[in-house]
């Protein structure tokens, strides 16, 4: 009976008996899933390529900046800048030392002028030494004598304008080339300052 049927009919009945519809549906689902996965993969590849291009551009930019910095800051320029700064530092230090020396010299000049002014005030405007000696107070003579002795030793002392006490002494040592300015405090005795002055001289 099978041999009497048409081949096409036989094939059709065979296919129906196999019931391949669920398999076709499964294959369709698998094909759809593969297509979805391929789309997701293509999207991730495009995103990775975009990130790679962005990083490549950033790398090129940073490389260019690095090359420019290396070119503009060569070792020779760095050494030249260091030498220039050292020279400027030396000149600044020398100028500061010169200014300090000038300030000390001017302070000595001012102290000397004050001492001379004090001496002239004690002598009087007329300049008559004998008459002035008769008119002057013995205390003024003692002060004048002390000032002369101190000045002969290289010491200029100044009074405080408020209470008239000796407040500052400028000691010059021409042999050593030293200058010391001493602010005299009442809590130290005259013996202490006398010893200090002699040690400084």
Curated annotation (Swiss-Prot):
GO terms for cellular component: cytoplasm; Ndc80 complex; nucleus; spindle pole body. The keyword Cytoplasm applies. Keywords: Cell cycle, Cell division, Centromere, Chromosome, Coiled coil, Cytoplasm, Cytoskeleton, Kinetochore, Mitosis, Nucleus. Residues 39-124 form a coiled coil. Its main location: nucleus. One of its GO terms (biological process) is cell division. It is found in: Nucleus; Chromosome, Centromere, Kinetochore; Cytoplasm, Cytoskeleton, Microtubule organizing center, Spindle pole body. It comes from the Eukaryota. GO terms for molecular function: microtubule binding. Belongs to the SPC24 family. Component of the NDC80 complex, which consists of NDC80, NUF2, SPC24 and SPC25. Acts as a component of the essential kinetochore-associated NDC80 complex, which is required for chromosome segregation and spindle checkpoint activity. This is Probable kinetochore protein SPC24. The gene is SPC24.
């Amino acid at each position: 009976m099978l041999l009497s049927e048409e081949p096409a009919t036989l094939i059709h009945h065979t296919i129906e008996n196999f019931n391949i519809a669920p398999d076709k549906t499964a294959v369709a689902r698998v094909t759809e899933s593969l297509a979805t996965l391929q789309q997701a993969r293509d999207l991730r590849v495009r995103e990775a390529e975009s990130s790679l291009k962005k990083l490549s551009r950033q790398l090129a930019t940073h490389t260019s900046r690095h090359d420019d910095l290396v070119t503009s800051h060569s070792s020779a320029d760095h050494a030249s800048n260091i030498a220039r700064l050292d020279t400027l530092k030396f000149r600044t230090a020398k100028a500061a030392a010169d200014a300090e020396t000038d300030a000390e010299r001017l302070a000595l000049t001012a102290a000397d002028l004050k001492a001379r002014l004090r001496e002239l005030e004690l002598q009087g405007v007329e300049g008559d030494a004998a008459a002035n000696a008769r008119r002057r107070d013995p205390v003024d003579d003692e002060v004048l004598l002390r000032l002369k002795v101190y000045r002969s030793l290289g010491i200029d002392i100044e009074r405080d304008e408020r209470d008239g006490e000796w407040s500052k002494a400028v000691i010059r040592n021409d042999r050593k080339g030293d200058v010391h300015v001493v602010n005299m405090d009442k809590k130290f005795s005259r013996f202490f300052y006398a010893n200090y002055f002699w040690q400084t001289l």
